[in-house]
């Protein structure tokens, strides 16, 4: 059951257009600071942070700190393949 609960959490994280756009940016760029994601998506910082936290909680992305900046990146390359499939729809 635990495996399916984790899978459901991951699928829920994929279930939002903003999160899919964030994942597309990360798939294309490797890693990005929050400020660049905000600039690209033209959404407020609290909105982007909220979505990044959901992706992080689901284990899809991680953050690394460089000085005062947080850089986010995709943990598993299979996520990049999922984003490619979404782009082909």
Curated annotation (Swiss-Prot):
The keyword Cell membrane is annotated on this UniProt entry: no
Domain of life where this protein originates: Archaea
Pfam families xrefs: HTH_5
SMART domains (alphabetical): HTH_ARSR (SM00418)
PROSITE patterns: HTH_ARSR_2
Domain HTH arsR-type: 1-89
Gene3D superfamilies: Winged helix-like DNA-binding domain superfamily/Winged helix DNA-binding domain
Keywords on record: DNA-binding, Transcription, Transcription regulation
Transmembrane segments annotated in the record for this chain: none
InterPro entries: ArsR-like_HTH, HTH_ArsR_DNA-bd_dom, Metal_resp_trans_reg, WH-like_DNA-bd_sf, WH_DNA-bd_sf
Entry-linked PANTHER family: ARSENICAL RESISTANCE OPERON REPRESSOR ARSR-RELATED
Protein name, per record: Uncharacterized HTH-type transcriptional regulator MJ1325
High-level lineage: Archaea, Methanobacteriati, Methanobacteriota, Methanomada group, Methanococci
């Amino acid at each position: 059951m635990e495996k399916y609960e984790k899978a459901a959490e991951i699928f829920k994280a994929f279930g939002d257009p903003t999160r899919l756009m964030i994942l597309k940016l990360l798939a294309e760029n490797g890693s990005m600071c929050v400020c660049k994601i905000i600039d690209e998506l033209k959404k407020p910082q609290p909105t982007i942070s909220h979505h990044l936290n959901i992706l992080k909680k689901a284990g899809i992305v991680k953050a690394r700190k460089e000085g005062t900046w947080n850089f986010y990146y995709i943990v598993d390359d299979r996520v990049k393949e999922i984003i490619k499939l979404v782009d082909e729809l």
